[in-house]
Amino acid sequence: MAKRGKRYQQLLSLIEKGKLYSPKEAVSLVKKLATAKFDETINLAVRLGVDPRHADQQVRGTVVLPYGTGKEKKVLVFAEGEKAQEAREAGADYVGGEDLVKQIESGWLDFDVAIATPDIMGTLKIPSRLGKILGPRGLMPNPKTGTVTNDIAKAVKEYKAGRVEFRTDRYGIVHVPIGKASFSEEALYKNLMTVLGTLLRLKPAAAKGQYFKSIYISPSMGPSVPIDTKNIADLIKQEEAA
C-alpha cells in the first residue's frame, strides 16, 4: 500500500486510536479533518450485518436528507403530455421521450438522476434499450427507489431537495453522502441520523445478529472517524421521538 502523505498523517493523529466516537463527537471531528482547498463531501459508510448474496438480505432504498447533500442534482424525466408538464413545473432539468432515449443511446449522460412514468418505460422499451447504459451507472429508473412513478412532481422535488439512493455493495456496506464540510454540525448530525434511521427501518427480517457492524464518516480527502454502534438503535429512536 502506498504511504500516506504528511497532511493525511497529521489528520490521522487527531483521531484517538481505539476510540469509538458518539455521532455528535464524530461530526464535530470530521469537520476538523476537512482541510482541503475545496468544500469536501462528508461520506458515511455503514457495514451491515447482512449477506447481500441473498436477495432477501439486500438493503436498498432512498432517503431525503433534511439539509440536502450540498450538491445540485441534474434530474432527467421520461414523460409525455401532462406528466411532462408536471416534471417541468417541478424543476426537472431535462424532460422528454424518444428524443432523450436517442440522446442517451448516442452517449449523452449529463444527468444525475433519471425518473420515468410506468407507461413510458414500456412504450419506449427503456429497460431493453437503455439497461446496459444506465444500469451499470446506477441511473436506471426503478420502482424500488421511487424513480418509476406516476407522482412525477413529488419525485423531482425530492431529488432536487436532497434525496439520495443507496444499496448494499457486495460486502454489505452502504455508502451515502451526508453533506459538505461547510455544513453546520447540527445539519450533518441530522442528515447522519436520518440515514441511520432509514437503514434501521429497512432491516431485513432474514438478517441475524448485530445489524450495524461498523459506522464511519469521513471527508473526501481525509481519514475515517469510527462511530460507536453499541447503543445506536436506541439513539436513533430517541432522535426520531424528539
Swiss-Prot record:
Q: Name one GO molecular function term.
A: structural constituent of ribosome
Ordered alphabetically, the record's keywords are:
Repressor, Ribonucleoprotein, Ribosomal protein, RNA-binding, rRNA-binding, Translation regulation, tRNA-binding
Which GO cellular component terms are attached? large ribosomal subunit
Q: Name one GO biological process term.
A: regulation of translation
SUPFAM superfamilies annotated for this entry?
Ribosomal protein L1
| Keyword Ribonucleoprotein assigned | yes
In terms of HAMAP family, this protein maps to: Ribosomal_uL1_B
Function of this protein? Binds directly to 23S rRNA. The L1 stalk is quite mobile in the ribosome, and is involved in E site tRNA release. Protein L1 is also a translational repressor protein, it controls the translation of the L11 operon by binding to its mRNA.
Binding partners and assembly? Part of the 50S ribosomal subunit.
NCBIfam families for this protein: rplA_bact (TIGR01169)
Q: Which family does it belong to?
A: Belongs to the universal ribosomal protein uL1 family.
Name of the protein:
Large ribosomal subunit protein uL1
